[in-house]
Amino acid sequence: MSTPSARTLPLSVPRASALYIGALFGPGLLLLPGLAAQQAGPASIIAWVALLGLSAIFAAVFAALGQAVPGAAGAAGYAGAGLGRRAATMTRWWFLAGVIAGAPIVCLIGASYVTALTGGGPLARGAVAAGLLLAVLGLALGGVRASTMAQLLLVALLIVVVVTAVAGSSPAVRPANWTPFAPHGWLSIGRAAATLMLSFVGWEAVAPLTGRLRAGQLSRVIGIAFTVTAVLYLGLAVATVSCLGRGANLTVPLADLLQLAIGPAGRAVAAAAALVLTAGSVNAYISGASEMLRELTAVPSQKGPNGPGHAPRLSAHVLLGVIALVGLVLLGLSALRLADIVALVSVPTAMFLCVYLSCTAAATRILTGPARVAAAVAVLAVLAVLAFCGWQALLAVAVVAAVASYRSAAAGRAMRTVSSSFRPVQPDPIIHGG
């Protein structure tokens, strides 16, 4: 869910398409196809197709928002434009909580590929993930930030790995792997959709780019981005079911597919790619979350040469510390088998679903015509997927919403206090009277 460059220069169709694809692709593809197949079996393909349809609706809604509210700063800006300041604050907090809960999960994905190569159980995987998380946080503490070009290169690496794995493993297709089609019942498709949703966020990050595209370019860019993601997503999902089957270890599907494609070296290639993708993605997430934190923690102050200003904002070092603390706790729970990967993934998924819920709900008030209808459909679809995230994730969402509401109310009181302190002094009617 990386944020594109803020420059206002016009974009060409190829570069805009690359930025769109870069916002949609992420390291979740290293895990989620296998996780969905574990949850729903071959029927997980239905979840993929349904979410691709929902993704097309998201694309239309956020493109329309980008044109209707060109000055909005991403998801929180859209929520604020349609639903008000408190909704914008909640959206920022949900995004921030999604990054805090999601960063260690991404590191756990990378660690799974390392231990699939080197051997080791949950404790070893947790230790590798903790080391990876602390290393990335250390780089961020030192000021290292992934540029837009670096993020696009990481996406290109992921695409190459996926294409190689899918195409190379095709001789291993087994039709028998498609039966039984829904071994865990039809409701498992909803649970798989909730898991996969993490791979379909990103349209909101590139919506501001609509103002940098010339007339007629937007539909082409969205069409290219959607086609590329749909082909790769479905190709990977079909290959996971067709080639690996139910008996395989589906926590590292790309490693297994690459092993089928290029031989024993496939696991080493997958592990190396997973480490690079994990580090780059977490770094990009932290960069976006740091800016979000600065917006959230700007405290009104009475100091300043021109009246009310802002006190120094909360340091991003606090964010890194919180991510480290929360991350080590979550990784510890995973290492001790007190929380499975599905439960861990559901928390950031629910947070980002709430971000989408606030944006699409705002869109029903901002947009008109077919775009408003699409936004209403998106609201219903997001609510349906959110219902399958599990009570733990929904409880986490409620806690974050309560914190956001409290912070928003406190900020409102502070602003009113500052404003009252700088009211103009009225003339004394006795001294200055006519």
PLM regions with names:
Residues 1-34, 38-43, 56, 60, ...:
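Membrane-interface "cap" regions at the ends of multi-pass membrane proteins
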Residues 20-28, 88, 154-168, 225-233, ...:
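Small-residue-rich segments of transmembrane alpha-helices in multi-pass membrane proteins
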Residues 57-133, 137-141, 155, 274-295, ...:
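Hydrophobic transmembrane alpha-helices that form the core helical bundles
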Residues 76-80, 84, 116, 223-285, ...:
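TM-loop-TM module centered on a large, flexible mid-protein loop between adjacent transmembrane helices
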Residues 124-172, 183-185, 222-226, 345, ...:
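Membrane-interface loop-to-helix entry segments
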Residues 348, 361-434:
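A generic transmembrane alpha-helix motif of multi-pass inner-membrane proteins
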